[in-house]
Amino acid sequence: MTSRRMPVDRDPVEPGPDRPLTILVDGEPVAGTVGQTIAGVLLAAGRREWRTTSAGGAPRGVFCGIGVCFDCLVDVNGLRDVRACLRRARDGDVVVRQGEPEVVA
Amino acid sequence: MRHVVVVGAGPAGLAAARAAVEAGARVTLLDAGDGLGGQYWRHLPDTRPAGREHVLHHRWETFRELGDALRAHPAVTVVPSAQVWSLERPGGGVRLNVLVGEPDGVGRDALALEPDALVLATGAHDRTLPFPGWQLPGVYSAGAAQALAKGERVAVGRRVVVAGAGPFLLPVASSLLQTGATVVGVHEAGRIGTLARGWLNRPWELAGAAGKAGELAGYIAELIRHRVPWRPGEAVVAAHGDGQVESVTVARLNERWAPIPGTERQVEADAVCVSHGFTPRLELAVAAGCALTPSRFVMVDDAQATSVPGVWAAGEITGIAGADAALAEGTVAGTAAAGGDTRTATARAAGRAVSRARAFAARIESAHGVRGGWVSWLRDDTVVCRCEETTYGRVREVVELTGSHETRSVKLTSRAGLGPCQARMCGRTLEELLGDTAPPGVDRRPLVVPVRLGDLASLPSSHPHPTASHPTGDQT
Ligand SMILES: Cc1cc2nc3c(=O)[nH]c(=O)nc-3n(C[C@H](O)[C@H](O)[C@H](O)COP(=O)(O)OP(=O)(O)OC[C@H]3O[C@@H](n4cnc5c(N)ncnc54)[C@H](O)[C@@H]3O)c2cc1C
Ligand code: FES
């Protein structure tokens, strides 16, 4: 595993206790805690890519982390093109890998 | 009562909102994020509050005070999750179009505001120069590492390389350490001579920036304590790995930031965080018609007034000088926007802080500013535009075939800069590669973010639908 979340009991920042939630990512349950973004849940679980580019078929995940680059787009509960780094996860969210965004200039 | 709208709740916007309400205005403070604080004071959300948030922050008490004062004040309306997506100028006034709700959601509440005075405090995002392999998962902007550490308590990797240019690399390395990562090294492109000339020249000027200097000294002490090497005159010139980062190539740079042949070495790492400076978020300022400086920040006078009557600007959209500067500029801008007296003691003290901050910004630029030699670490197959996967070779080919050095026409032919990020990641790079850097260049964007067609449809019919420039798909 590469990316990960600081364990609460070792964290100098002392976040409140975890309030578990589960999201479904391409059919697989991934555990997180209330307050995380979808990108936060995925990265904490060691997943670093969740989109495939259409031109090169290349994997992508977070790049800018603050909603500017649009690399992190996912389909959430049937709605495409949601920036995973901005959207807070909710228990039961159904997250599906998407290809090229529909937003075109 | 004069209505002042402040866009952005980072240090600049928070200070502006407070100064404006203290000067007697009614204030609406909008931010796209669901919490206050902007980039500098990004923190765990209210749904997961931290007991000791101050560990990761400087001047956390200042933030708490500002936030509490604004939320408690009867003449202030704080609207979080409020994305300003466009700005129009009906009859010479200003109208902000806002969607309030979950990011990229459907059915958000539409809001149109026509303030008497507008303060823009939209901040900046960090800029990463392309290098071979930078599109691999595991390569992040340094800002992403910082945002994830502060806002999620997530470390982007276990063995992390931090690289690029500027003092920002230091707090990023510090946050990574505090989030349980090993920082393999911090590689600063500026060579020691350039850094020394930038920082040690006229040292008396720095006395006023003692707070910032102390903050940076603290980070350096922390790096030493953790035995993290800080190496000036070096860059990450390539990232390697099968599907994600496994190692990077680090090379020494000359004065112009060109890699020195023979100095390359491979470093094992599972993440690399790279930032070469900041790009201001100018969409709203450009839409309002604000003049830009030659280095493409919003041009302001001593009272933070832009070239457009009724519009003020503060913080990193006016220059990259850090959070203290943003706070001081916000105070001046908010006072002026409310029609208050900028000659009061508080406003004048803030004004002096602004001048010191500008000197500090000039030092950052002279010590860490991008030098053109970096282009020599590109290869023909290096991705320049991340969205459209346009390579450096393709950009060169288009220039050769069309003979054009105009960013607009090269974009249209190569597709670079036409993807969903609307050239926010590659725009400045393209312009530099083409030598076409006249303002506003790529900074003119009719929409601040893509908006779903459903949201446009639900807007009052008086709204011109700016769909023409974004015709297809679910989003425009
Ligand atoms: C990811 C990141 C992390 C950083 N971390 C640090 C750090 O730890 N230490 C440090 O010294 N410096 C840091 N910086 C530098 C930082 O930008 C400044 O020091 C400081 O935050 C600038 O303050 P500001 O008020 O000008 O802008 P910001 O703090 O960037 O605030 C701007 C705000 O405007 C909002 N906004 C922008 N456009 C819109 C819109 N259209 N509609 C609604 N809201 C909008 C944004 O959501 C944001 O909250 C960071 C920068 C970035 C990009
Ligand atoms: S990571 Fe850049 S938009 Fe989400």
Stretch-by-stretch model annotation:
Chain B
Residues 2-65, 169-210, 294, 424:
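Beta1-alpha1 glycine-rich phosphate/pyrophosphate-binding loop at the start
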Residues 7, 30, 113-123, 268-276:
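Short hydrophobic core segments
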Residues 65-100, 179-276, 280-281:
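A Rossmann-like FAD-binding core segment of flavoenzymes
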Residues 106-117, 260-270, 307:
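Core beta-strand elements of the Rossmann-like FAD/NAD(P) dinucleotide-binding domain
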Residues 124-161, 167-172, 294-302:
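Glycine-rich dinucleotide-binding loop and its adjacent helix/turn
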Residues 141-149, 271-321, 350:
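FAD-site-proximal beta/loop scaffold in flavoenzymes
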Residues 314-352:
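A conserved FAD-binding loop/helix module that cradles the flavin
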Residues 381-395, 414-432:
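Local cysteine-cluster metal-coordination motifs and their immediate loop/turn environment
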